[in-house]
Regions:
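C-terminal catalytic region of ATP-dependent kinase domains
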Residues: 469, 490-496, 608-783, 787-792, ...
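Active-site neighborhood of phospho(di)ester-bond hydrolases with catalytic His/Asp-centered motifs
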Residues: 47-49, 76-82, 117-124, 217-221, ...
């Protein structure tokens, strides 16, 4: 009896500690259900999720139809995933197919006469029948019923943007794409431009920043915030199943263990939500809409509103805790109204009584500029980047952190005052820039050409957020702190006026460039509400490296510029789309000449040219902030940048480049992706071109663009170092050429390719052909590698059906790795010594011989090309082939 009593008491305590969710409507904020919306609605979104458990029109679907009968054409219905229970859409004639079709018809019939748009998004249950192939079956069925683009994202891809209006953007995410185990879906991403989870985050960050100033709805099946069972809130009944006490223990384990990806406690789910939360802070009007939980919820956390409407055919309990403002475990729907004044409201409707149960405002109306600024300004303004107190440091401090270029941040320089209304015929602000440390504003002229104004004072907190705290929003925590001040001081290792010298030098050697000009930008009416964050300081204003500058000589008169991500996609499309490799090598040598170590992929744009039958891309380097930088100045950073491999790129500018390998830490993966065929004579010719055309006279001319107030002995010191490095450029080039030739990387196209690998003693020749009409056709790559220089050659077939033929006699071969990629590949390995073949285990491939070592695995990372796979360790650069220890690394 005593034992039973103890157990019962323990059970009650556990129940009380864990708390219970329920099915009742719960409120923590004012409920405005009786308030009529007198605002003019711009667009309405009808939200219903998890509606796939109903084979007929009842409950929430009936409620939705009644709402749609009154809806305007400026409306969109979003089915928020789990459109079919329990396991997606089976194949024709498979068990469960009829029931699944009936479930879809019940939903599509509701919108058959709807005058607005309808979008279905996938949930986890929609993935449970063949993964990508099952999704495509559902996509095909829905698009036949409703029309094109009614199932998004398409082709099992992760993200899609829909422009609803000029002020409203819809970003659709397939959250199960991120959460699922890719190794169980060998065909995943084969029809997608995004191939990695990190690339997905890059795309989301780009879209969320581009949508600044607009109401941005992010639709994804799995909620970012929830107070339902997937967030660890359970009903009393769940504590009793399968038995009392055991049910409670089960719930505690589920809440703390994160065993499955359906719950937020799961590591991958939590990683997704934390990163999305952090990136979404860059847009002040983001609204999440989700299903997954079979309830109606409204939560506002971290300034981000979350609408949960996942009770389209089921209901489950919720609990009013934390930042929740409303929850109800009832079958129902939600309506989101975006109003013409920029405000937005949400209303929830329950099938119990078919009535509105909660309504509240999400965002208030757009703020209008209330301050009227003067329109007439003087011609010049003297201003400094930092206040005097920010550059005054003790002797002890400077012994630790160095002198840097700190002094010049506090020097008041005379800059022309600019009125944006008249510059370049008049410029209008478009949106904030997306840099990780620069405070920038994008501007547009009357022709649509874009410009950028960037403050010379960098944003330390923004840098911390982007680099050190990707999964946690910290901007507010670091403002006006010692950490922010210290980082601002570290930034003084780069010379604030260095970018103004680059154009003169680059012009002489045919390297494209932007043309920054120093201005003082006062707060003014042209900035509108951007006056809150911009104005009354020094800026550089330059052409944005983008389309619309076809009259610009420094862009080669190209009217079309693309990003690095888009360049790589283009190069994989066809052998007639090529990179001017020589121009890229010249630009990279110029980076090393001026000491610009910050050359990651987003620091480049690519100008497009049509030359005969070829499309040729040439590099346009941008953001030259780190030219001539002395980041390693001072005792502390001088030591740290030598000890920590990740900081070795921050070498202080001097006549010599002590380690080209580590200086090029950031651009190395891109170099390996783009510099494929060029031999040493190409590099040598570019060195000669640079050293011949950049003379001391040209260097003197370049530095006349420094403000006269900072043109002192330090400028002469930089010029002396630049001349010295110019004299050492051949040595620098030779060292880096050897570094990037240690590994050869050959890539095919996303069409049928034939790779001919001929092996000789100490040498290997790789020739790549297109296959046309079943036979070898045009050669698009040919190079002979020497074993003295190259340790390994990696050959990626990419997509479509590729053939690999390995021939040749001898013993002392370069190791060759063949990575087939998607579709059916053929391997004819006549000499298998030091040949490793990687391909999907569950896909059909043909092996003509049994020679060579086969690594057949469905490991996604092993089989899919990603130029960022190349990794550093403390001694050498190595590739990453998944996590298989047998890869030989």
């Amino acid at each position: 009896m005593k034992i039973k009593l103890t157990i019962c008491i323990a059970f009650v305590i556990l129940i009380n500690l864990s708390g219970c969710a329920n099915f009742k409507p719960q409120f923590k904020t004012k409920n405005d259900t009786e308030l009529m919306n007198e605002k003019k609605v711009s667009h309405s979104f009808y939200l219903i999720g998890d509606a796939g458990n109903s084979a007929n029109e009842s409950g929430a679907l009936d409620l939705l139809r009644k709402q749609l009968d009154k809806a305007s054409k400026n409306s969109t219905v979003i089915f928020l995933g789990d459109n079919i229970y329990p396991k997606g859409l089976p194949k024709k004639n498979d068990k469960g197919r009829v029931d699944a079709i009936n479930q879809l018809k019940a939903q599509t019939n509701v919108v058959s006469n709807f005058s607005g748009e309808t979008i279905f998004i996938p949930g986890n249950h929609d993935w449970y029948n063949g993964g990508i192939t099952g999704l495509k079956r559902q996509e095909e069925f829905i698009e036949k019923k409703i029309g094109k683009n009614s199932f998004l994202p398409e082709n099992g891809c992760p993200i899609e943007k829909v422009d609803i209006s000029k002020d409203i953007v819809l970003i659709i995410i397939d959250s199960e794409w991120y959460l699922t185990n890719w190794d169980k879906h060998p065909g995943i991403n084969s029809d997608c431009e995004i191939k990695t989870r990190e690339s997905f985050f890059d795309e989301y960050e780009s879209l969320i920043k581009k949508a600044r100033g607009k109401t941005t709805i992010v639709a994804l099946h799995h909620p970012i915030f929830t107070n339902g069972s997937h967030g660890g809130q359970y009903s009393f009944k769940s504590h009793l199943e399968p038995l009392p006490i055991i049910g409670t223990i089960k719930n505690i384990l589920r809440r703390t263990g994160g065993v499955t990806t359906v719950d937020q406690q799961n590591k991958r789910y939590n990683d997704l939500r934390k990163r999305i939360i952090t990136l979404s802070q860059e847009n002040e009007k983001t609204i999440f809409v989700s299903g997954h939980e079979h309830s109606l919820q409204y939560i506002v956390e971290d300034n981000l509103p979350q609408i949960v409407s996942g009770s389209g055919s089921k209901s489950s309990a919720t609990r009013m805790v934390g930042t929740g403002l409303f929850s109800y475990g009832s079958v129902g729907i939600a309506r989101l109204d975006i109003n013409e004044d920029g405000s937005s409201d949400v209303a929830f409707y329950s099938s119990v009584g078919n009535k509105k149960v909660f309504q509240t405002e999400i965002f208030s109306a757009n703020k209008k500029a209330t301050v009227n600024y003067p329109s007439n300004f003087s011609k010049f303004q003297r201003s400094a980047i930092y206040a005097e107190k920010e550059i005054k440091k003790s002797n002890f401090y400077t012994s630790i952190w160095g002198e840097r270029y700190r002094t010049y941040y506090g020097v008041k320089v005379e800059a022309p005052i600019v009125n944006l209304d008249t510059l370049f015929g008049g410029l209008l602000p478009v949106r904030k820039g997306g840099g990780h440390q620069s405070k920038s504003l994008r501007l547009k002229d009357s022709r649509g050409s874009e410009y950028v104004m960037r403050a010379l004072r960098k944003n330390a907190v923004q840098y911390l957020q982007a680099v050190a705290f990707k999964n946690q929003y910290v901007k507010d925590e670091f403002r006006d702190t010692y950490t922010e001040g210290l980082l601002l001081d570290v930034f003084t290792g780069s010379h604030p006026y260095a970018p103004f010298t680059i154009g003169t030098l680059a012009d002489k050697i045919g390297v494209f460039h932007t043309n920054p000009v120093l201005y003082y930008v006062p707060k003014q009416n042209a900035l509108g509400y951007y006056n809150d964050d911009f104005g009354d300081e020094l800026y550089m204003i330059e052409e944005r490296a983008s389309d619309g500058h076809g009259n610009q000589k420094s862009f080669g008169y190209s009217d079309e510029l693309i990003s690095t991500t888009d360049l790589l996609k283009e190069l994989h499309k066809d052998e007639d789309i090529i990179l001017d490799e020589t121009a890229y090598i010249r630009a990279r040598l110029f980076d090393m000449l001026i000491g610009d170590w910050d050359r990651h992929e987003d620091q480049w744009r690519w100008a497009k040219f049509k030359e005969q039958s070829k499309t040729v891309y040439r590099p346009v380097p941008r953001d030259r902030d780190q030219a001539f930088s002395i980041m390693a100045d001072g005792a502390l950073l001088g030591v740290v940048t030598k000890i920590l491999p990740s900081l070795r790129l921050m070498q202080s500018y001097g006549e010599e480049l002590k380690s080209p390998k580590w200086f090029n830490l950031e651009p190395y993966p891109l170099d390996m992706a783009l510099i494929n065929e060029s031999v040493k004579t190409v590099w040598d010719k570019q060195v000669q071109l640079i050293t011949t055309n950049i003379s001391e006279k040209i260097i003197d001319e370049a530095f006349t663009f420094f403000p006269k107030e900072v043109s002192d002995e330090s400028v002469e010191e930089i010029k002396r170092k630049l001349i010295g490095r110019l004299q050492n450029l051949q040595t620098i080039s030779d060292q880096y050429f050897l570094e990037i030739n240690k590994y050869g990387v050959v890539k095919g196209t996303n069409k049928d390719d034939f790779f001919e690998i001929k092996r000789h003693q100490n040498k290997t020749t790789v020739t790549a052909y297109r296959i046309k009409k079943g036979v070898k056709s045009d050669v698009f790559f040919k190079k002979t590698y020497s074993k003295l220089a190259t340790k390994e050659i990696w050959i990626y077939g990419l997509d479509d059906d590729d053939c690999f033929e390995v021939t040749g006699q001898g013993t002392d071969f370069i190791k060759v790795r063949l990575v087939g990629g998607q579709n059916k590949d053929t391997y004819n390995v006549q000499n298998g010594k030091k040949v490793v073949v990687y391909d999907f285990k569950t896909k059909e491939n043909e092996f003509v011989t049994k020679r060579g070592l086969r690594k057949l695995t469905d490991n996604y990372e092993t089989n899919v090309y990603d130029y960022k796979k190349l990794k550093y360790n403390s001694n050498l650069l190595i590739p990453s082939f998944g996590s298989n220890p047998d890869d030989g690394f």
